[in-house]
Regions:
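General beta-strand structural signal in soluble alpha/beta enzymes
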Residues: 16-17, 39-42, 71, 97-98, ...
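Active-site-adjacent helical/loop segments in soluble small-molecule enzymes
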Residues: 134-191
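A glycine-rich helix N-cap at a beta->alpha junction
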Residues: 1-31
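Short beta-strands and strand-loop turn motifs
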Residues: 10, 37-43, 119-121
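Short, structured coil segments at secondary-structure junctions
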Residues: 10-11, 35, 91, 144
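Receiver (REC) domain switch/active-site residues of two-component response regulators
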Residues: 13, 67, 146-147
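Glycine-rich phosphate/pyrophosphate-binding loop at beta-loop-alpha junctions
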Residues: 44-143, 183-229, 239
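A conserved regulatory-domain signal marking ACT and ACT-like small-molecule sensing domains
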Residues: 204-288
Length: 288
């Protein structure tokens, strides 16, 4: 939604078709054939690849002794251009591409040594949800890139949350895959590492979910369900324990009617803010 709204805001006519890049591109070719419109390639074009290769030159200008570079791969334009620039200047620099586990098209294509149609599952990294890599980009990447690795949505979520909280960067899921890999698979000590953060087009609703999931993963947002006797003061006893632990109640759902709640009892589900895992574990222990 964020990308669509922004594009329409600049005056473009946006036609929504398909659930991933490949399906949308197929429709775009139909429209171009019917109307005579010009197709502008997203990645599989020499000029697009060359333009994105400027990123590689800028990396070398800022950090000429870099050891490893991590960057996202969808169709492969960014990776192909960057790896050409890097390897031309210094073949010893390691370039690692990162894809979503839901759309591992370039990963599988390089592995099979032939362009391979893969993927189709949903991923929050919609910017790299490409089922088939480009012809030009595949040939470049299979010959020059050192490695392609995969990450899942949970790892991407953690990376986005870390970028927002620590760096104050809003990076879209597809752009955060490099950091997502490094968080779970730490680089060798002493290495000079560059991570390319590509793109900031992220929907605000998704961003809210990312924040909640990031807080939950760190036990800073805690969901608890307790079964209480349905009598005056029972809930207050729970609240007193939470207050003593210096946690904050964000939301409460009080349920007497569900079939799994016995007569004379009440189920209470609470969302709590805590300071982290240690405080959360201490609170749970106090409530047991």
């Amino acid at each position: 939604p964020a990308k669509v709204a922004a594009t329409r805001g600049y005056g473009a006519n946006v036609i929504l078709e398909g659930i991933n890049y490949d399906e949308s591109y197929s429709k775009a070719k139909e429209i171009a054939k019917e109307t005579g419109a010009t197709i502008i390639q997203a990645f599989d074009d020499p000029q697009i690849i060359a333009a994105q290769g400027v990123i590689g030159l800028e990396i070398l200008e800022d950090l000429p002794d870099v050891d490893e570079i991590y960057l996202p791969i969808g169709g492969g334009g960014l990776a192909a251009g960057t790896v050409i620039a890097i390897k031309e200047k210094n073949p010893n620099i390691k370039v690692i591409g990162v894809q979503s586990k839901s759309f591992p098209s370039m990963y599988e294509s390089v592995k099979q040594n032939v362009r391979t149609l893969t993927g189709g599952d949903r991923t929050i990294a919609d910017g790299i949800s490409v089922k088939m890599p480009g012809e030009i980009t595949f040939e470049i990447i299979k010959n020059l890139i050192d490695e392609i690795v995969l990450v899942d949505d949970e790892e991407i979520t953690k990376a986005m949350f870390l970028l927002m909280e620590r760096m104050k960067f809003v990076v879209e899921p597809a752009g955060a895959v490099g950091l997502a890999y490094l968080i779970s698979k730490k680089p060798s000590p002493g290495k000079k590492v560059v991570v390319v953060l590509a793109g900031g087009n992220v929907d605000m609703y998704l961003l809210g979910q990312i924040v909640d999931k990031g807080l939950a993963a760190m036990s800073r947002l805690l969901k608890l369900s307790v079964l209480l006797p349905d009598r005056p003061g029972a809930f207050k006893e729970i609240v007193d324990i939470i207050t003593l632990a210096n946690a904050n109640i964000v939301e409460v759902v009080h349920d007497r009617l569900s079939s799994d709640v016995n007569a004379g009892s009440a189920s209470v589900t609470m969302n709590l803010e805590t300071q982290g895992k240690e405080q959360a574990e201490s609170l749970i222990k106090s409530l047991e």
